[in-house]
């Protein structure tokens, strides 16, 4: 199955340009200003297509949509790549448990994801690549690692030797005990017999009875999780791209191990110049996750008649680095805000919106400070609705500011 992205919303250029984006870099643990060239390159890890897309997914992809929008407003072209993990153990397990064909399950969930992203006005990636369609390039990447002497086999499976990765652990800054604990929790196999080190991870899984497998020079099998993203990112963006990101549960092992693979395969570093990770969204006191089953789905909210722009505004009310819990009150507040903004955008004369544009630009450039950006729009809307201001061009500039930078369409 060849992946296709979703339709791109129209993005109207604003007067002048915004400034550079400063974010909290996971590797340094500090604020850093990202300084791309003419083209900003970004890779974001995609979903495993079952139970998609819940609000945790939406919050993550909204965050990187803001990065995309800020970069574009600053005058950059953005080369954005995202994968889809359309073959993986959890997908196969869900298909078996529900009596579905795994390919049909994946195709259905990917289509729902596309529809949700389009409804939320998330700018689509230039390349939206599934693992299945990328099988040859992933197998070639594993072969490159094997040629570098950093792999070994256990019963036909190919493993990466963590001891052969220079600087392993520098991304996550975790000690060995914490690494082993998270590796076991997040899809690793530290207890497998025959491994040289419990932290060594799977690159290629040899064919098992009853499991899908592909013919490659490595033999029949399928890739491990981490190498899928490292292979696709290197193929599409090269090394040293500007930003690698995802949820903060990907810091270790996924991004740590993927970076080690990319650096060893290419002989260069870093894989990415900056790493940005998004906090988790909770429900009923726990992280929203597939394993817990405590999910709120974008598609369900949409089917219930919720305006996708209200969903987007509810997510925008929270900062990407702060974990939070979804409540019905979040949505009610967002719906009220959306109505107020739409009413303000419809007045004939309003206060000058150029200061509003400057404030929203400044807030987003400052580590994606969405709360400050929303407050600035609220203040302008309140003034406009009170009859203040006599600028007939202001409502149009306000609408474009909110649409282009925050991704919120105020047309009904």
Swiss-Prot record:
Transmembrane segments: none annotated. It comes from the Bacteria. Its cofactor is Zn(2+). InterPro entries: Cys-tRNA/MSH_ligase, Mycothiol_ligase_MshC, Rossmann-like_a/b/a_fold, tRNA-synt_1_cat_dom. Binds 1 zinc ion per subunit. It catalyses: 1D-myo-inositol 2-amino-2-deoxy-alpha-D-glucopyranoside + L-cysteine + ATP = 1D-myo-inositol 2-(L-cysteinylamino)-2-deoxy-alpha-D-glucopyranoside + AMP + diphosphate + H(+). GO terms for cellular component: cytosol. GO terms for molecular function: ATP binding; cysteine-glucosaminylinositol ligase activity; cysteine-tRNA ligase activity; zinc ion binding. Its EC number is 6.3.1.13. A motif ('ERGGDP' region) lies at residues 185-190. A motif ('KMSKS' region) lies at residues 287-291. Zn(2+) binds at residues 45, 229, 254. L-cysteinyl-5'-AMP binds at residues 45-48, 60, 83-85, 225, 247-249, 281. Keywords: ATP-binding, Ligase, Metal-binding, Nucleotide-binding, Zinc. GO terms for biological process: cysteinyl-tRNA aminoacylation; mycothiol biosynthetic process. A motif ('HIGH' region) lies at residues 47-57. Monomer. Belongs to the class-I aminoacyl-tRNA synthetase family. MshC subfamily. Catalyzes the ATP-dependent condensation of GlcN-Ins and L-cysteine to form L-Cys-GlcN-Ins. HAMAP family: MshC (MF_01697). PANTHER family: CYSTEINE--TRNA LIGASE, CYTOPLASMIC, CYSTEINYL-TRNA SYNTHETASE. This is L-cysteine:1D-myo-inositol 2-amino-2-deoxy-alpha-D-glucopyranoside ligase. The gene is mshC.
């Amino acid at each position: 199955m060849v992946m296709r992205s979703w339709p791109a919303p129209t993005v109207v250029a604003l007067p002048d340009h915004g400034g550079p984006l400063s974010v909290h870099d996971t590797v340094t643990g500090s604020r850093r200003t990202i300084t791309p060239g003419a083209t900003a390159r970004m890779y974001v890890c995609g979903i495993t297509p079952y139970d998609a897309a819940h609000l945790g997914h939406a919050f993550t992809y909204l965050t990187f949509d803001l990065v995309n929008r800020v970069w574009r407003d600053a005058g950059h072209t953005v080369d954005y790549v995202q994968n889809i993990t359309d073959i993986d153990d959890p997908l196969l397990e869900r298909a078996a448990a529900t009596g579905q064909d795994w390919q049909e399950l994946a195709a259905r969930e990917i289509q729902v994801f596309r529809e949700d992203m389009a409804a939320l006005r998330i700018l689509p990636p230039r390349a939206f690549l599934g693992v299945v369609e990328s099988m040859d390039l992933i197998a070639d990447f594993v072969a490159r690692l094997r040629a570098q002497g950093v792999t070994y086999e256990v019963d036909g499976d190919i493993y990466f030797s963590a001891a052969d990765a220079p600087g392993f652990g520098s991304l996550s800054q975790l000690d060995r005990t914490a690494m082993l604990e998270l590796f076991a929790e997040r899809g690793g196999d530290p207890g497998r017999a025959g491994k040289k080190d419990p932290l060594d991870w799977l690159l290629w899984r040899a064919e098992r009875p009853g499991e899908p497998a592909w013919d490659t020079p490595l033999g029949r099998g399928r890739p491990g999780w981490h190498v899928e993203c490292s292979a696709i990112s290197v193929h599409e963006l090269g090394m040293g791209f500007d930003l690698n990101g995802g949820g903060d549960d990907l810091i270790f092992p996924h991004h740590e191990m993927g970076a080690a693979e990319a650096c060893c395969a290419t002989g260069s570093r870093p894989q990415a110049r900056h790493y940005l990770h998004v906090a988790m969204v909770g429900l009923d006191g726990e992280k929203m996750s597939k394993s817990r089953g405590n999910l709120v789905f974008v598609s369900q909210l949409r089917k219930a008649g919720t305006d996708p722009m209200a969903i987007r505004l509810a997510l925008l009310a929270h900062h990407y680095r702060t974990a939070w819990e979804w409540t019905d009150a979040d949505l009610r507040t967002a719906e009220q805000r959306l109505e107020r903004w739409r009413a303000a955008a419809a007045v004939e004369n309003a206060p000058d919106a150029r200061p509003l544009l400057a404030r929203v630009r400044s807030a987003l450039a400052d580590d994606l400070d969405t709360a400050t950006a929303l407050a600035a729009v609220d203040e302008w809307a309140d003034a406009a609705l009170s009859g203040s201001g006599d600028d007939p061009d202001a409502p149009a500039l306000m609408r474009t500011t909110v649409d282009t930078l925050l991704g919120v369409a105020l047309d009904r």
